[in-house]
Amino acid sequence: YLRLLINPSDSVSLLRILNVPKRGIGKTTVQRLSDAASQLKIPLWEVVNDPEAVRSLAGRSAKGILNFSEIINELQSHLLSSSPAELVQLVLERSGYLNELITAGTDEAEERRRNLQELVNAALQYQEESEDANLEGFLSTAALSSDADNKDTASNRVTLMTLHSSKGLEFSVVCLVGMEQG
């Protein structure tokens, strides 16, 4: 959810969250949306966020997608006015994911809920340590921390990462590859 708020063209993130929690959006519907985006050469979000395109789908799927689009648009409206921790908490509440985990009552759901609370705590810590705390900076810091935790000490290797993730790291050789959608 957080990645999609920062970059609505991130179709991979969109596909991961479109039906989480369950909204009655099936694989066939997702494939039709993806096909339409590919055919029109536009990001998947533009198709998902187009009420006319969505209304042409089956009733339950259309309702789920319209609800999802409404949630994302509301969350994006808070992007500039809310702190990273507030945004994380807002995403958990508005998406319905936190409520789904609470009502599931399983050990796995409880573990996920604790992990999400750690995410909120990490956002709070980031805010305390950063003067101009924003969601994009928090996600970058979290990605760098995660990469550093998993860092392999082998010296003869290639590390693939985004340019944004590489900020502040030192490498003897850096190769930049440009890719554009469409």
Please describe what each predicted stretch is.
Residues 1-182:
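Conserved helicase C-terminal RecA-like lobe
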